[in-house]
């Protein structure tokens, strides 16, 4: 979310979650004919819907890792099929246009975790001063 942007409304969150569930169900059934999607385990981690509910960004990650580019291309090619299936599962006036994007939050979390567990950071954490060693407001440090 960019600076100054309004947080999503309850309706956006609810519709996003309904879409995430519906897309995950369609992917789980594996009815795709696209060779890049056949036999691939794909997780839909989040769906962000625009305020007017006309566009939805679908965040996906392949289970077991691997190259996500062919999966994104396959999902883009299967967009019409997905929208048709979603229209049968979710009651909306119009199914949003779907945009697919790799979810990098797991990679970011893993990178942060490895940084926190690095020997240098561990040393700093283990040798951090205790709370009672910090001067308080009434203590001028003398």
Curated annotation (Swiss-Prot):
Cell compartments where the protein resides: Cytoplasm
A GO term for molecular function: ribosomal small subunit binding
Name the record gives this protein: Ribosome-binding factor A
Superkingdom assignment: Bacteria
Family the UniProt entry places it in: Belongs to the RbfA family.
Compositional bias segments (type: Acidic residues): 131-142
PANTHER family linked: RIBOSOME-BINDING FACTOR A, CHLOROPLASTIC-RELATED
GO BP, sorted A to Z: maturation of SSU-rRNA
Disordered, as annotated region: 120-142
Described purpose of this protein according to its UniProt entry: One of several proteins that assist in the late maturation steps of the functional core of the 30S ribosomal subunit. Associates with free 30S ribosomal subunits (but not with 30S subunits that are part of 70S ribosomes or polysomes). Required for efficient processing of 16S rRNA. May interact with the 5'-terminal helix region of 16S rRNA.
Oligomeric form and interacting partners: Monomer. Binds 30S ribosomal subunits, but not 50S ribosomal subunits or 70S ribosomes.
A single Gene Ontology CC term: cytosol
Record keywords: Cytoplasm, Ribosome biogenesis
Biased composition, class Basic and acidic residues, residue ranges: 120-130
Signal peptide: none
Pfam families: RBFA (PF02033)
């Amino acid at each position: 979310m960019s600076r100054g942007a309004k947080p999503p409304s309850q309706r956006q969150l609810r519709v996003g979650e309904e879409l995430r569930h519906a897309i995950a169900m369609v992917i789980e059934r594996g009815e795709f004919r696209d060779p890049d999607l056949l036999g691939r385990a794909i997780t839909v981690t989040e769906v962000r819907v625009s305020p007017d509910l006309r566009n939805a960004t679908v965040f996906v990650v392949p289970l077991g890792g691997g190259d996500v580019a062919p999966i994104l291309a396959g999902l883009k090619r299967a967009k019409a099929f997905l929208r048709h299936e979603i229209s049968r599962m979710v009651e909306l006036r119009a199914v949003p246009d779907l945009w697919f994007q790799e979810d990098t939050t797991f990679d970011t979390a893993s990178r942060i975790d490895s940084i926190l567990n690095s020997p240098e950071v561990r040393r700093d954490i283990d040798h951090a001063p205790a709370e009672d060693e910090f001067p308080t407001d009434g203590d001028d440090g003398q």
